[in-house]
Amino acid sequence: MNCEKFTRNQSGNILVHCDRSDPNRTYKNQEIDHSKTYLNYNLAPEHTGMTDYEFMKKRCEEFKVLKRKDVNWLVSWVITMPTDYKGNKALFFREAYNFMANRYGKGNVVSAYVHLDETSPHMHFCFVPVIFDKKKQEYKVNAKQCINKVELKQIHPEMQEYLENKLQTKVNILNGATAEGNKTVEQLKNEEKIKEKAIVELIQNPTEEIKKSVIEQIPVEQKENIIEAVSYTHLTLP
């Protein structure tokens, strides 16, 4: 999981990236397999007569929001399905959506697109960060207070517990990336590429020299997953 915040001007681009509605648009992410884009779907309710951006704007205007250009109007959590999860994919994302919608308010959800046209299945859960100001007794839009250090620390274990109870199976939301904090999508993709390269080399060249060379390049938190992936080759990794 990783979290990003967007100003009003930045929100349009991420919302367009999520819905993939324009077939002629060139997306920055080169890993999109457009032949699979039709498999993507949105778990959030439709905003009748409004685009996602228009709904976000309307929701923000319903509450107190600072007019400064640097104020964040939108928050996006990217929830990636764990590689070792073997259960029902649709159910995983449905329950992940339910957890997030209940946490941040169903009325604040802008979109929740599940992307199946990229390397790893994931959901972009986008919402307006509305909080209740106890001192002033009013609701307001404030991403900094909504996604603070306490929230970043608590959400991962709480989501894992919720999903495991609902899905009745182990769900590794708490992984190396979580332990180090919320990483960017680019960082997560780079780590995934390192893992894939290591697995290929170990399978194709299962010699002691290759094993030692490859293992030295693998981040500590990824070794366990790689060991599981190549276990059928009978390799012994340190």
Name the predicted role of every residue range.
Residues 1-235:
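N-terminal nicking endonuclease/strand-transfer module with a His-rich metal-binding environment
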